[in-house]
Each structure stands twice: as structure tokens, then as C-alpha cells.
Amino acid sequence: PPALPDAATPVPSEGAKLIIREAMKEDTRPLFVLLLGPLTDLASAYLQEPRIAGRLTAIWIGGAPYPVGGPEFNLGNDVNAVNVVFGSTMPVWQVPKNVYEMMPVSMAELEYRVRPQGAVGRYLFDQLVAYSQTPESRASAFRTGESWVLGDNPAPGLLLYEHRFQFDWVPAPYVTADQTYAAIGRNR
């Protein structure tokens, strides 16, 4: 969906509907919502149904390192949505850029482990090889030489592996127009 026009107007989407539907189900199991891009769907769901805040935990791949912040792809796609979510009481496990960039993989490993996995594996690997030859790829922060950063993978990893990771609980900042973090004292 397009970015929120402001911090009070939701953008209708199938993703927002799904989040609301799942969060409002009567179920004793915890609900984790993994967000591998902008927070538009989650913010829209919250603006439409604020009761979801106490019924899920969001795991978001996005934002720059603390305490300063700065430009980052997922955050930059919808700053208003980040401020809606950070201004809510919703639990958020944020995985910022300095953490998700720690998931590099070599082209050789992708060729060994992904390419042999049938038509889909071959397609994914071939697409990556073709993209790696473009000028955009050579300028990408997600590629360094013969390796790529698989930045979205920490989200499922947080759920699949035992919780033996190091983390910090910090007050949610307000995100400014230049994507830096500001402590305003109003967020949780």
C-alpha cells in the first residue's frame, strides 16, 4: 500500500485487514506479526482497531542504529507509520540496520544451497545473479563484493531460535522527517 498521508489516516489494505482479523480472534496463543518492510499495514490496522495493541507483538526489520537514527529503507518508506506504531502501546521488537546487516551470505553459498532447490531455487538464484550485474546492484548497501546481506532473515530467526540474544529495551523515539530519532518523552 502507499504510505500513510499523515499519522491519523489509515491506508486500507488486505494486510491491515488480516492483522486486525488475526489479532481480534479469541486465541490464547501469542500472535507475532513479522514486518519486513514499512509499517504501513500495521499502523493502518492500529488506526482502524486500536485494541490490537494488546493482542500482538510486532517484529520489525527497519530503522537505523540507536540513539541517533538516520536514513534506512524500510523506515523511509513510511515515517508516519513508524510514528503511529511507536506512539502506541504495542510491543515492538525492532531489528535496526546495524543488526540486520549482520546476516551476510556469499554468492557461492547461495549457489550451493538455493539454486539446487527446484525451479524456484534456480529462479531466485538466477535473478540475483542477473541483478548483481546491474549498476544499481553495484551501488547497493546490501551487496559487498561477492556477498549479499539477507536483512529480512533475523525476523523469523527471532521466533525460531531460543531467546539467547542480547537486546535493549529503550523508549520508542519520535522519527523526524530526516529519519533521525528524537526523544519526546511521550512514547512508551
Residue ranges and their predicted role:
Residues 2-108:
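Active-site histidine-anchored catalytic micro-motif
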Residues 75-76, 80-188:
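Conformational coupling and interaction surfaces
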